[in-house]
Every structure is written in C-alpha cells, then in structure tokens.
C-alpha cells in the first residue's frame, strides 16, 4: 500500500502515557469521524466518548487535526510500502492502485482526509506529517519499480515514475476529497489501471488523440 508509517506521533512532553487512554481516544475519534464528519468533530465529544478529560487528550495531541491524523493512520499499524514484484508490470501496478484505493476508502479516512487537507495549508507541522505519511519512501521506491519495468521492455522509454505516481495518488485523493459517496471500487481500480497502463505503453513521440 502507499501509506507508510512515519515518525512517532507528535505529542507534548509530560508524564508517561496510559496506553489504554490512547487506544480509547483513537477509537472514539474514528467512531465520531464516521458518525458526524470532520467539521463537526470536537475534542469535547471525543473526551466524552472515550471517558477521558480534555487535558488528557491535549497532553497527547496538540490539535484535533493531529489527533485525527493518528486515528486514521495509526502509528502501530503495518503501513509499510509493499511493492509487488512479479515481473508483470500491469498486474503489479493494478495491485498497487487497488491497495492504495482501499486505504483511502476506509470510512474514517473518507471522513478525515478532506478536513486534513484543508487544515494542512495553515499548519506546516501537519503538512509535514501528511507528506511523510502519504509518501515517505514510497515515491522513490515506486520510481525504481517503474525503471525496472522500462528495463524489461514492459513500459516505454522515458516514462517518469514520479508522474505516474502523482497520477494514481492524485486520483485516489480526488476520489476521497470530491468523489461520489458510492463507487464500485474494484471497477474503478481496474479502469484506472487500464488507463495508466495504456499511457505507459504509448510509443515515443505518439500523441494521444
């Protein structure tokens, strides 16, 4: 999948954490995101649902956005960027696209991402967290994956892995931020894969009509 574990979550200094409180707060945040959405989500509501105090939350997370970020992309979840490498570029690209769409289509992620993307514009720390979480080493690893496909003759010469990366990640983010509520995810992934595979195989110098 594309999302990769980033550095440890940012928390303010203080006494050792009660891991039970962490778990309860993160679970309450995920539940409320799905129930009320990001704009209506409040720290007070999370505290009530988790049966903890507001100060207990703010000792761990500096803002609602940073709490939501960790709730939807847990630091202890295996989010390593796994690249399938079967030697079949089209099949492997389809697997990567499908797994990326699956991550972005989780109910709590669908509820959180538009708000996080809006907030990160004025929050450099959150922007850095999101950049590390959404990319980390994935961009470089994907570019190397594309280079190997080019070397095998499965993709056209001169194909830029970073552009292909932006194409399907951008499609996944748009699907989350502005797409319809109900999407046939497997069909969407198949059509996106077909479109991008076709683009990777265009002969040099040939223009798309």
Residue locations for each model-derived region?
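Basic, helix-initiating cap at the start of DNA-binding domains
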Residues: 1-49, 55, 65-66
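C-terminal peripheral helix-coil segments that are non-catalytic and often amphipathic
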Residues: 1-10, 95, 136, 140, ...
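Short, structured helix-loop boundary elements
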Residues: 22, 43, 65, 86, ...
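Short amphipathic alpha-helical segment with a characteristic S/N-K-E followed by hydrophobic residues
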Residues: 40, 63-68, 77-79, 93
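Hydrophobic alpha-helical connector segments
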Residues: 80-113
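Helix-loop "lid/cap" segments that line or gate small-molecule binding pockets
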Residues: 98-104, 113-122, 193-200
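Amphipathic alpha-helical packing segments from all-alpha helical-bundle domains
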Residues: 107, 111-114, 124-151, 161
């Amino acid at each position: 999948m594309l999302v990769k574990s980033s550095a440890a979550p940012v928390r303010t200094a203080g006494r050792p954490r009660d891991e039970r409180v962490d778990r309860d707060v993160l679970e309450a945040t995920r539940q409320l995101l799905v129930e009320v959405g990001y704009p209506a989500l409040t720290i007070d509501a999370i505290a009530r649902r988790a049966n903890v105090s507001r100060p207990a939350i703010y000792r761990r997370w500096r803002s609602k956005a940073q709490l939501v970020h960790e709730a939807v992309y847990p630091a202890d979840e295996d989010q390593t960027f796994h690249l399938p490498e079967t030697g079949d570029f089209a099949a492997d690209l389809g697997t990567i696209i499908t797994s990326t769409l699956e991550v972005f289509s989780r109910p709590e992620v669908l509820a959180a991402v538009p708000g996080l993307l809006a907030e990160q514009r004025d929050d450099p720390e959150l922007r850095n967290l999101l950049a590390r979480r959404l990319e980390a080493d994935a961009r470089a690893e994907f570019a190397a994956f594309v280079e190997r496909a080019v070397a095998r003759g499965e993709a056209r010469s001169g194909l830029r892995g970073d552009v292909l990366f932006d194409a399907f990640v951008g499609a996944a983010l748009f699907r989350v931020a502005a797409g319809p509520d109900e999407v046939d995810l497997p069909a969407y992934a198949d059509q996106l894969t077909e479109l991008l595979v076709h683009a990777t195989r265009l002969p040099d110098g040939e223009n798309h009509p």
